[in-house]
């Protein structure tokens, strides 16, 4: 039986969101109403190369009768009994509730190990609930944001010993070495799997017109009225022999501009589409390049770890192209430095000019998003970076020691830096390394993630 992890907790703490994050596709219905997930859902999950079975359970309800809540609780108890480890989720924004306390007490009496996970920890709003959760007596909580993908490395760390005990990881391999590339993850086109490409942007910027140009047919509804495309529409086609899947979505507007319930659902579907895509093309109107809402969408794409390409539509009517491009680059530099160097293509969706350049940019960005760097090459680069600019000294004048770096995964490129006292490495030095990775290994415009943790250099031990 594979290593099995059960996700448990009271209703509406984000269990299905975490399940979807780990499984990598939307198998569980996500809604902000308690009790949406009434049955157990199972899927194969992957976390930094660790493979396991994950179970999304119904929310615990404090009800001992034969109500549906009682049956949901019975299903959850069964899932916990069959799991190697359980993740008890709480909502750090809501704080610890009496139900959280009740079921923490209940789980303590069961033999299955329990890891406390404080969800919705993005930003400052979740901090009080995170600190309060220590009072549950379940050990140190793992702070995550299932919605934004934050804290996944820390979750890996918490699960690692349990995975070793279950035989899912070997003790020698418990530090996350670069995982073997799955088919299609090494930057080479995989003819058996389409590249998923989403077209997103504000309403009425020409997303569906662009989609129709790519497909060569009027497959997507177009018109001057904003909001014509309510649902995300997926269409497969071939480009130069490469299978592609195009997803055209409803436009993302500012929240204050979203009035009806159907459009709210469409915006939610767009956000989900971004998460499930590989390359996201953000379409902008040349008359209003990179306004506040464009930046919000671009940040969302980067936070979700997707590959980003910018497409400036209606370029054929721009009076001063050079000034417009400079304004765009300056705004990116100041407002979205993590997307510095992102591929930017000017085009006309109506006439088709620039479409081939757009597809070149999509394929090139996808290749970089899949890039893997050999550990030896990575550490030669790291030595050079440290020699050029050593990390600042620790309090008392002690030298900060960086041991080595490894790439944990691609899609997006994710690196782990092993060092003494990882919590004391300044954020500015992490940025220095991330910028260096982008420049040295040709990763402009691709999300690059760097985690810092303590640990010995296994390569030094092997040499000895």
Curated annotation (Swiss-Prot):
Position of the signal peptide: none
Pfam family, one: KH_dom-like
The keyword Nucleotide-binding is assigned to this record: yes
Record-level Gene Ontology MF annotations: GTP binding
Entry keyword set: GTP-binding, Nucleotide-binding, Repeat, Ribosome biogenesis
Coiled coil: none
Boundaries of every EngA-type G domain copy: 3-167, 195-370
All copies of domain KH-like, residue ranges: 371-456
Role of this protein: GTPase that plays an essential role in the late steps of ribosome biogenesis.
Quaternary data: Associates with the 50S ribosomal subunit.
NCBIfam families, per database record: GTPase_EngA, small_GTP
PANTHER family membership: GTPASE DER
Name of the molecule in the record: GTPase Der
Gene of this entry: der
């Amino acid at each position: 039986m594979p290593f099995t992890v059960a996700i448990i907790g009271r209703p509406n703490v984000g269990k299905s969101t975490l399940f979807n994050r780990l499984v990598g596709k939307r198998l569980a219905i996500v809604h902000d109403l308690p009790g949406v997930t009434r049955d157990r859902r199972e899927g194969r999950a992957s976390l930094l190369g660790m493979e396991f079975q994950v179970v999304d359970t119904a929310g615990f309800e404090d009800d001992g009768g034969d109500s549906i809540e009682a049956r949901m609780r019975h299903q959850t108890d069964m899932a916990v009994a069959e799991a190697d480890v359980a993740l008890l989720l709480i909502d750090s924004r809501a704080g610890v509730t009496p139900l959280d306390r009740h079921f923490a007490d209940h789980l303590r009496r069961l033999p299955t190990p329990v890891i406390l996970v404080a969800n919705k920890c993005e930003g400052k709003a979740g901090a009080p609930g995170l600190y309060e959760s220590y009072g549950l007596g379940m050990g140190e909580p793992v702070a995550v944001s299932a919605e934004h993908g934050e804290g996944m490395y820390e979750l890996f760390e918490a699960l690692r010993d349990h995975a070793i005990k279950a035989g899912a990881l070997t003790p020698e391999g418990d530090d996350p070495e670069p995982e073997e590339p799955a088919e299609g993850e090494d930057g080479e086109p995989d003819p058996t799997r389409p590249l998923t490409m989403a077209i997103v942007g504000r309403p009425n910027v020409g997303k569906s017109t662009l989609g129709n140009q790519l497909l060569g047919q009027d497959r997507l509804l177009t018109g001057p009225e904003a909001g014509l495309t309510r649902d995300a529409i997926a269409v497969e086609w071939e480009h130069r022999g490469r299978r592609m899947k195009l997803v055209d979505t409803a436009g993302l507007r500012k929240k204050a501009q979203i009035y009806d319930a159907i459009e709210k659902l469409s915006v939610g579907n767009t956000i989900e589409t971004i998460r499930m895509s590989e390359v996201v093309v953000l379409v902008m109107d040349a008359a209003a390049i990179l306004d506040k809402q464009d930046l919000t969408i671009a940040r969302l794409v980067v936070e979700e770890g997707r590959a980003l390409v910018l497409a400036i539509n209606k370029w054929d009517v721009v009076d001063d192209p050079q000034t417009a491009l400079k304004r765009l680059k300056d705004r990116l530099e100041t407002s979205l430095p993590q997307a510095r160097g992102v591929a930017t293509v000017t085009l006309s969706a109506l006439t088709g000019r620039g479409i081939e350049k757009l597809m070149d940019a999509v394929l090139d960005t996808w290749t970089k998003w899949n890039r893997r760097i050999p550990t030896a090459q990575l550490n030669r680069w790291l030595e050079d970076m440290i020699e050029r600019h050593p990390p600042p000294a620790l309090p008392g004048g002690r030298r900060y020691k960086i041991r080595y770096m490894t790439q944990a995964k691609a899609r997006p490129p994710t690196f782990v830096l092993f060092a003494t006292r990882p919590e004391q490495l300044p954020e500015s030095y992490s940025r220095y390394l991330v910028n260096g990775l982008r420049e040295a290994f040709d990763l402009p415009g691709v999300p690059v993630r760097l985690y810092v943790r303590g640990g010995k250099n296994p390569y030094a031990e092997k040499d000895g």
